[in-house]
């Protein structure tokens, strides 16, 4: 019975962990992306040339 309880207890947690990890990584990546780009606009030399520079200025 203990093994079955462990399996029953671990499986949902693992699924939740995976969902949680995905959402956290996505949120952190998104926040980092939009948090760093505005900083980059203050340092145009860091901004890549051409299209990317235009995108930086738009932000």
From Swiss-Prot:
Describe the task this protein carries out. Answer: Lanthionine-containing peptide that does probably not show antibacterial activity, since its analog [+7]Flvbeta.f does not show antibacterial activity against M.luteus. Also does not show antibiotic activity when tested with [Del2]Flvalpha.a, an analog of Flvalpha.a, which is encoded by the same operon than Flvbeta.f. The bactericidal activity of lantibiotics is based on depolarization of energized bacterial cytoplasmic membranes, initiated by the formation of aqueous transmembrane pores.
Q: Which gene encodes it?
A: FlvA2.f
Cross-link Beta-methyllanthionine (Thr-Cys) position reads 41-47, 53-56
- Protein name, please? Lantipeptide Flvbeta.f
Could you list this entry's UniProt keywords, alphabetically sorted: Secreted, Thioether bond
Q: Which organism is it from?
A: Ruminococcus flavefaciens
Which residues are annotated as pro-peptide in the record? Answer: 1-27
State where the protein is found: Secreted
Q: One GO cellular component term, please give it.
A: extracellular region
What does the entry report about post-translational modification of this chain? Answer: Contains DL-beta-methyllanthionine, when coepressed in E.coli with the flavecin synthetase FlvM2.
Q: Does the keyword Secreted apply?
A: yes
* Modified residues annotated as 2,3-didehydrobutyrine in this record: 31-32
